Amino acid sequence: MQRELTIPSNDAFREIATKTEEEEMLAGLMAAQKHLPCKFFYDEAGSKLFEQITRLEEYYPSRTEKSILKRHAGELMRGAEGASLVEIGSGDCSKISILLQALPEVILKTSIYVPVDVSLSAIEESRCKLEERFGAIEVCGIVADFIQQIHLVSQYENKIFCFFGSTIGNLDRRDAVRFVEKLGKLMNTGERLLLGLDMVKDKAVLEGAYNDEKGVTARFNKNILNVANKILGTNFESEYFRHHAFFDEEKQRIEMHLMATRDITIKFPFFEGGLEIPKGQTIHTENSHKFTSHHIDEFASASGLSVRAVYTDSNRWFTLVDYIK
């Protein structure tokens, strides 16, 4: 069944559907290497679990990127009068709040914040928090798959795209280049892209960030099976899957999988039989590619943007690149 579009009466949000969620999930589960699109992590429960992940000691990307933003917020927001701050894959509002705090109220009144995310609940929560803290700024959220539907923001002027959290690393290398190329075509002269990149580093540090001792990342990973059950009407039982995350050094990426701990038959309500998942087989749920200086230049070349500034931390673990058209 096609998901209905939801347009709340306050007109602060827009939700746009592409192909059905069922089609996307089924295609992944029927593939030779079973997989589920990582955007399905972020139902209400998944969004809350990810917020917990960002506060974990092992998960350095969030706190490192925030420290960079805090240190350079004034520079980043210089000349932001009348800006449309478009946050791609916005999640919670903790990072954009750092930038908004650097703006005086008179400039906030001329600005628009446009969070783009697949999670309506995350956007609603962010909107409430931002209105309470920064009442002067207008918030206009778009609930959409930003990979397919980023063109929806083309109407906004004086755009500053904020693509934080190294979320671009969830895309395959070619798709990441294509996406920044698409952004470049949406941008007018003088508009900017703030891109957060998690850099290649020691394998132990990388794997530790995705295998926390408290098991929050494991719960987050397994929650995608609950989402599949809601969408497909299947009978996935998360206790029969083990969280498995590792760094592939050749591909320079973390891979997250769910590994079956026993032979499993998954039932579907709309056709007979079932999907056999033997013990040891995995469902690939996410890639998180890591980056080098080469990729910073590659993105600039593909998008037609120039590197305005590059910010990093003392360990050079995380980089924030300020691109301009």
Descriptions of predicted regions:
Residues 170-182:
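A short, conserved alpha-helix within the catalytic core of class I
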Residues 82-91:
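Conserved class I S-adenosyl-L-methionine
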Residues 1-40, 47:
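N-terminal auxiliary segments of SAM/dcSAM-dependent transferases
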Residues 92-108:
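Conserved SAM-binding loop of SAM-dependent methyltransferases across substrates and taxa
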Residues 207-289, 297-303:
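Substrate-binding/catalytic lobe of Class I Rossmann-like enzymes that use SAM or dcSAM, i.e.
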Residues 33-80:
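Class I SAM-dependent methyltransferase Rossmann-like catalytic core
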Residues 185-200:
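Conserved beta-strand signature within the Rossmann-like core of class I S-adenosyl-L-methionine
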